[in-house]
Structures are given as C-alpha cells and as structure tokens.
Amino acid sequence: MKLLLVTLLAVLGTETAFANQGSFVDEVSFIQYLDENTALEEVKNGNLDIYYFRIPSDRIDTFEAREGLQVYESTGGSYSILINPAESEKFNPFSISEVRYAVNYLVDRKLIVNELMGGFGVPMISNYGPYDPDYLFILDEIESFHFRYNPTLAEEMITNALESAGAKKIDNTWTFQGEEIELIGFIRSDDPVRKSIGAILSSELERLGFKVKKDYGDLNKAFVVVYGSDPSDLKWNFYTEGWGGRSAFVKYDPVGLGQMYSPWFSNMPGFNDPSYWNYQNDYLDSITQRIYIGNFSSAEERIDLFRKATNEGVNESVRIFLASKIDQYVVNDKTQGVINDFGAGVPSRFTPINARTETNSLTIGVKQIYQGSWNPIMGISDTYSRQIYDTLYDPAVFKHPYTGDTFPIRSSWMVETAGPNGNLTVPEDAITWDPLSQTWQKVGPGTKSTSKVTFDLNFSNWHNGQLMDINDILYSLYFTFEWGSEPLDDDKTFDTEYTPRTAQTVQTFIGVKPIDNDTIEVYVDYWHFDEAEIADWASLWSSTPWEIMAAMEQAVVDGKVSFSRSGSVSKGVNWLSLIVPNDAAIIREYLEEFKTSNFIPPALQNFVSNTQYVNSRYDSSIKWINENDHAIISNGPFFLDRYSPEARMIVIKAFKDNTYPFPAGHWKDFENVKFPKILKIDLPTVIKKGSVLSIPVTAEDASKIHYFLTNSEGVTVATGIKELDGKNADIIISEAQTSQLGNGANDLKIFVISENVLRPDIYTTSFLAVTDSTALPETTTVGFDIQDSKNDYVGIFAIIIGAIIVGTIVYLRRKRKSTQNLRH
C-alpha cells in the first residue's frame, strides 16, 4: 500500500477545470436485491438502471432475453477455498501440507466452470488468471502443476499422510486416537456457486471417509466465524471464498501474492492476532515483501520473485484457487456512460460518475447493502461497501481502467531516482515522525534515499465545507508512521491487521519536505522500472479530514472500538463503522471534547496554532454528524446522503461545490476502448516432428503475440514474443523444438495483446505430431476467421473453448519439490 494509507488507496491526478459538480446525475440510490432474477426483471422494466452483481448466463442467453438490456462482461473476480492449517488439541488433518495439497486433485475445476458457472469462467490454480497482466510471465510456472480432477490420486495422498500421522481408517471412516475426524465447512449460502462448491467438496471429503459438518452463512457471519476466530479453535476447516476483483485494474501488482499467500499481510489464518494461532511462512513473507516494497533491480528479477512466490503458495495450498470469473452485468438500454474497468468491472468508481440517464438520477441494485464496516483504515474491505465508497472520495493517483498504468487524479508529480543501486541526498530539514518522542524530527545530515517524488496536490473542499490542506496530508503521514511502527510495551497504537501491512511501507520511507501549501517532496527507499509506480508508492493523500482521523484514533486508543475485524473480536468491541449512528456519535463526542479542551493533535502542533482554524474544523464535522447521522466525510464527486438499514438502501448525492476540480464528463473517454482481436490463424492439425512449423497470425488493434507450446507430457518446448507487422506475424517453431513434441496431443496457446489495452485475446488448441510424413493427411492446415463482434470481450469465449480443449492433453503428475529445497 502506498504512503498514503490512512485512507484506503489514496490516489489521483491533477487538472483544474472548475465546475459545480463532477457527475452527470444528481443522485445515486443503491438498493439491495438479493435475488438476481428479480434484479434482472427490475433492470428490464427500468426500475433499476444497473445491477452490480452477475446475472446467471442462462437468463440472458437469447436475443429475446436481452431485450431492453445492455450486457457487459467483466473479469477480475475469482473463487477459492481457504483451508485452516492450524495445529490444535483436536486433530486437524489440514495441518498437514500434503493433505491440503491433495485437495487440488479433489476439486473438479472444469465442472465448476462449465456446470456451476455456465462456462463463464476459466479454471485457475494460483491467484493470477489469464486476465491479469502478470499472468503471461508466470504461465510456465503455473502450467507445471498440471492439476486435474483425480480423486483416486487425492485419496492416495491423503491416506499416506494421515497414516503417517497416526490416523486410522475404520469401516471407511477416518479416526484419530479412537475418535472420528470431523471437518467443518463454512459454506456461503448467499452465493449459489459457492454453495454448490461447498456441497461438492463436502461430498468428496465424506466419500474419502471424513465426517463433514456444513455451516452456512453470509459474509457477515464469515467475518466472525472464519476471519474473526482463533484458527486453533477449529470453528471451521475450509471456507468457500469469493473475490470480487480489485477496485482498479493493476498493471504491476505488488500486493496480490502477499495478500493471498503470505502471513505478513494479515490475510492468512490467524490474521496476525498475537493471541491466536497464526500460519507462518518466513520464505513466502520474504519473497512477497520484496515484491511489495520494490526490492528488485530489474523487471526480470521481479518476475523471478513472482515465480518463486507462486510456486510456494500453490504448494502450501492454504488458499486454493478454483476459477476466474467472467461476470455478466446488466444495464438498462437507456442508461449511458458505463465504464467497464478490467479490475472492478461495471461497478468501477467511474461508472456512477460518468453515467447518464433521462432522469438525472441513477438507481443501482446491489447484492448486499452493508457487510463489515465503514472506516478508512481497516474497514471498507468487502466488495459491496467498496463499490459505493469509491465514489465518495478522490484519490491522489489511480490506475487506468484498461492499461493498469498509474495516472494522476488529485496530484501531479515529478520523479527523480538513483535506483536501483544508487542514492540521492535528502535535505537536512526534511522531516519524519518519531513515535518515541512523539514529534516530527529532521532527518539530519548525510541521509540518503533511492528516489524523490515532488507532488503538486490539487485540494478542494471536504464534503463538510472545509478546505482540504497540507495538515490533512501530514496527519495521514503521521498516522502511517505511528500505527505502522514496531509496537512498544503496552503500545495502544497497534492494530493486528493494519500494523504488519503498514510496517512494510514505513521501512521504505525516509522523510518529507513541505514546500508550500500544496507542494511536498517525498523521499523513499523505493525503486521501480516504471517511474509512475515510484510516484504511486510515494503518494501522500487522505480521504478523511484530520479531525475525523484524530477522533477515530482516540476512540480506538481508549478501547471503545477497533479499526479492524480481528481486533474487534479479540478485544470484544465494535468494528468501527462511521456509517452507523452509534459509532458516529462516538466520533462526535470526541470532537466536542477536542473543541472544549482546545486540543491540537501532537502531529499538527508544529504546523497549527490558529485556534479559529482548529475550532472551525471541529465545528464543521460536528455539524455534519448532527445533520447526517454518520461521519463519512470525504472529497469526491458524491457525498453520502443517507443509509437506511430498514429499506436496505444507501443514497449518495452529487457534491455541488465550485472547488471541485473535475466537470461532468471528465472521464468520458474511458467509455470507448478497442480490444485486440485475433482475426485469423493458420496451423496444421498434424505436423511432422523435426520440421519447421510456421503459424501465420492475423490480428487487429494489437501490438504483440505471446505464444506457449507444450508437448504431450506438459513440458514447454517453445515460448516467445512476436511483434506484429501491421496486422500480421509469423510464429516460427524450429526443427529442434518440434522434435521435442510428443505423439499425443500437443498444446499451443496464443495471446494477442495491445500496449493500450491489457486484455489479451486468447486462442488455445491441440494438435498431433508424427514421425512419418506419410501419416500426414492431404489437408493439414486449418484456418479460421473471427468476424467483428459487438461484444467487447470476443476473446473471452476463445478462452472458454480453449479451456475445454486443453482438457484433452495427456496428464502428467507434477513431482513436488521437497520442503527442504523450498525453505530458507
């Protein structure tokens, strides 16, 4: 995460076109519709403009079914199984890594995609799928596992592991020390796909001889049972997870491997709560932390780290990925301006901002209206709340919806770097927060940094009418240091989830130097081969006024609430949610107390002395809470008008303020995107080993072709990148390479990509190789043409078809590397 923290991903650039409001519509209503079929009819009838959840493919598979609708296909989400590896007084078979690994052969990924998901997905075995920019660089590592549904092999692996641990199978029932081994599966009942996945996995485990108890629930219950409990209590053994994609498309993902596989990110069983049993893996931590903080010297070294982390994460199998989703979203045909971000999909932050309707209002159906909590530190962590909250704030920088490149929104920048191996001199009067002395300290002479970023910040009014200023930025930075530093004895500025993550940011931060009211220099020990990523890492911003931050902080320090889910469970207090009236009242009480005592937070005492300014801040936020019954105050194009739990509805309204920098339509260009398309491929259905193979490819709106050729044993024999000459390129497979092909089905994957749109069109096929040219048929070349399609995601169906074809490849079980070779 960036230096900005304190407020979720801070981010965005800098233009100065002044307007009264940044959106076309005046009001957006988010209304809960649990049933997708009901929501579909409401969109057709015009009672809903958009539904922010996938629609079953069989409901919109005909022209008649789509009448009155626009259908958008989005990628980015996925399904996984989280397995509890805890050691406990009660025997837990999943504490044995071989048992966890065997689950990969117990789940039928093809069945999940083809039957449960109606073909709208792709099997996946790691956290990266075909739609992720980093996928192509680690594809051969992923392919090396060759998982397939093989319950016989799974049973063999599990039996060997359990018998070695002392378990016995009596009358087809696994026992340990005379007691039946019972597994508890927490199964999401609010998602039909995950409910079915849970039922199928439970059935497979029962068939192997385990007693399985099914515990059904939604995300709120999962926050308590799975994410909020001590894993060693064994309240759950496996959980059917679902991921809604990111809030933005990311070209160079620094977080994914750490989030999905590594303990330090506080997203693995135990969640870094010191009072709980915690999954540990120092090797994964070290690799993924290097990726996160940019501790590599080249793009090649970064890719090597990705390969190692992927290999270890899959081998450990604490989180097992099943399928990447292709979600179909429906939009009423009278609604315009939808922006289908490659990461967030239709629920991108840009869609409500850019949408246009005949009524100047927008009504969006959502699957859940409230899950988890709303606070900018460790709340807003679920898809449902993030989709709404992201429209309420502007970040400093953000990610381009189709390239994943970092671009400015509320801060422009200039980068100077000496990385990866050099350093810059930091001015002596640059400052950093010292948690021990509770003061800002000058860095002093001789201080060095790898990079320097100068930011020009584009401030506007907060929703409560107060002008953003440099104090909001400095308080955000203080908070990052205070709560991200190593905890001291009886340290109350520590959060079990937030602190370990933020500590990685803090160690790269050297100092800042405010230049004027809206310009600041940031010095970091961070390097990336893309300078925009350095700016992203160093960016300073806040989505929340400093006085709200100070009140939240004091409420947590006083033990009234917790920033995080796990902290709330372990301390027996509420998970702070600023949208809830009771929690907002706590914030108001602290603001009133601050005003009465003329309190100025220590982090601002060197910069603020004007009592009138401080009191105006307190007064404005107190007034806001009194009038709105919540404490969500931010700086984006919409403000939170009201949350009605009874009506299951949240309403946001356009922030009409002359200081807001972007006019309606500012992001309109994101509506139009040209996808790379494969138009034609000529390749033999049968080839002769030892001969040169030429494969002409024709594509449009594309710049490069990536290809991967594997033989019938699953060994990669050729891979490469070809530049397109106009629309054409020839893939040449040499004599030596074709000699390595097998007699069975050989697999070819072709990815056509564009520099401007990082969504590949993909073609996958299998062909035979023979040693005798007389065995070749008279007609050996198969050509196909793909006609132009109105469907932007023309390549997605090639992926689905390709995934089915791939299943014909002869399977070779991957030999696992020993633990000794993988550990350090």
Give the location of each predicted region.
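Extracytoplasmic/peripheral linker and loop segments enriched in polar/acidic and small residues
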Residues: 101, 113-116, 213-223, 252-332, ...
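Surface-exposed, Gly/Pro/Thr- and Asp/Glu-enriched linker/hinge segments
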Residues: 19-26, 58-59, 65, 93, ...
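Aromatic- and charge-enriched surface segment that lines or borders ligand/interaction sites
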Residues: 39-47, 90-102, 106, 424-489
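Long beta-strand-rich cores associated with HINT superfamily self-processing modules
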Residues: 256, 331-372, 380-384, 639-642, ...
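Append "and occasionally in soluble cytosolic enzymes with long acidic Gly/Pro-rich linkers
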Residues: 95-203, 207, 308, 360-365, ...
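Periplasmic binding protein-like
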Residues: 42-44, 48-55, 64, 207-266, ...
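Local pocket/hinge segments that shape ligand/substrate recognition
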Residues: 21-22, 32, 54-157, 175-177, ...
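Ligand-site clamp/hinge motif
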Residues: 20-61, 211, 663-689, 694-696
